[in-house]
């Protein structure tokens, strides 16, 4: 294998041509295919050997690109930099190619290229380690990044939200604080869209001074400017976003207290109502949000309220909520609809933030939902029917309300 690598390696800079580079790219393509095959068979030793060869090839290609700036004229049109040779030149064969080529580069080329993603083969459950784009590099297009992220199939609802959120206009940045505080129950999905938006646009990437997913989280703080191994997009969301996030959790608690006063729920039951709604939005999605935010206070607020309700001893409700979590297909469909519809918010945002009528209407709907939950608590025999009914009504309400 070392001999094959040496033979593919040009002897001098003068001999480096497009054919030579293409040959090495083909070799890398073959290596990636072999790595994927061995991973599917569970042969980790062979995977490691091929990954080392692939790593050396990529390092060599990066060295060529750095040492000879004129090499861009010799390279194929799409991959003008070595990093683009990974996702741009080999993206057709599967997600692991991009992940392997990017992951190997992340060790040796942190200063020159935008490395992204730890090798997914080594971390099969680690799609959250998504590209950390450095501030100096803008060669990696957002479409390529969207490809890299959307191929992470093991993050529920994740591949759905990334493409849709890329279309969100930039104007959300200014009004995100007001929108988050007024969106009430809409907030959990909306910050995800915001973080995706920040991650997928260079404008927001430059704004994320101290962070990086949403996803890290995808996210999607996807592109971390400090090339740290923060998982998913915004392991630490940007400064102005962080207070609004904390404010949103306080807003939720305030809403819960408001619900408890309206409907005579105890604080535990009102908290349980809100986690149930979030769970409908998808613990699959929201668990991803938690890891993307990496914000202990917000995470803990959500988890504590949920656990507090579980500890309340309502076993039937806990089972029902577990059923929702297990119905990942329904969750993802609902989350996808919610996120895709939220693309309409940015255009309506400036009119929506001052529009107390719309917010009041939505709050009123949530109060009605609270009544349904209250009736569910009192008549446990029809829990399944009443549990499903507000959920189905939420989908219809979201479709009409957001469009």
Swiss-Prot record:
GO BP field: chromatin organization; positive regulation of dendrite morphogenesis; positive regulation of transcription by RNA polymerase II
Disordered: region residues: 72-111, 152-171, 224-303, 318-403
Methionine-rich intra-molecular domain, as annotated region: 149-238
Major subcellular location class: nucleus
Spans annotated as MFD domain: 252-324
Comp. bias regions, Polar residues: 92-105, 161-171, 263-277
GO CC, one annotated term: nucleoplasm
Residue ranges of the motif SH2-binding: 50-53, 360-363, 398-401
InterPro entries: SS18_N
Subcellular location: Nucleus
Chain span(s) of sequence motif SH3-binding: 378-386
GO MF annotation terms: transcription coactivator activity
Keywords, sorted A to Z: Activator, Calcium, Chromatin regulator, Nucleus, Repeat, Transcription, Transcription regulation
Annotated region (N-terminal auto-inhibitory domain), positions in chain: 1-148
Subunit structure: Homodimer.
Function: Transcriptional activator which may be required for calcium-dependent dendritic growth and branching in cortical neurons.
Domain comment as written in the entry: The MFD (multi-functional domain) domain is involved in transcription transactivation, nuclear body targeting and dimerization.
Family: Belongs to the SS18 family.
Protein name: Calcium-responsive transactivator
Lineage of the organism: Eukaryota, Metazoa, Chordata, Craniata, Vertebrata
